Amino acid sequence: MGKNNSKLAPEVLEDLVQNTEFSEQELKQWYKGFLKDCPSGILNLEEFQQLYIKFFPYGDASKFAQHAFRTFDKNGDGTIDFREFICALSVTSRGSFEQKLNWAFEMYDLDGDGRITRLEMLEIIEAIYKMVGTVIMMRMNQDGLTPQQRVDKIFKKMDQDKDDQITLEEFKEAAKSDPSIVLLLQCDMQK
């Protein structure tokens, strides 16, 4: 992006103020930082993975970053622009519990069919285990569950109709009624 795009267009800024939890000033700061890190104005998967690697240096964050990238990339074009980035950041950092659950569901629903299968859940849980690294996982995972055991425990609590799939409704209902499920989904057993 050249000098023409170094500032957010007023209509884009207004749209983001209306559709995120950030103020106009915060959006301008985030945009400035985004352009500093991504002069082209877009992030590709490899660049996104490098950001995750910086935050999780003790494990392998590449697989989890791939899933987060897919969830951030709303239009499916293989890149994340500022709008996609800031909207996802708004939900994950300042969104309501309901918004965060919807976002998490999207991440776990790998094929986007509106249902989470055991294999989809296992894929994400394994990616979380790899991302945080063995030493940290041992401290966090005080119950000693393997990824498969964690998936089984989550499905036992969430899959109300026992069809081996979790719908968005089941996901939200279980998370609201039992906060420990959210901890299981995050693989964070510290209370």
From Swiss-Prot:
Superkingdom, natural source: Eukaryota
Record-listed Ca(2+) 2 binding positions: D109, D111, D113, R115, E120
GO molecular function: calcium channel regulator activity; calcium ion binding; protein domain specific binding
The name this protein goes by in its record: Hippocalcin-like protein 4
Function: May be involved in the calcium-dependent regulation of rhodopsin phosphorylation.
Protein family per UniProt: Belongs to the recoverin family.
Lipid attachment residues per UniProt (N-myristoyl glycine): G2
Paired cysteines (S-S): none
Domain EF-hand per the UniProt entry, residue ranges: 24-59, 60-95, 96-131, 146-181
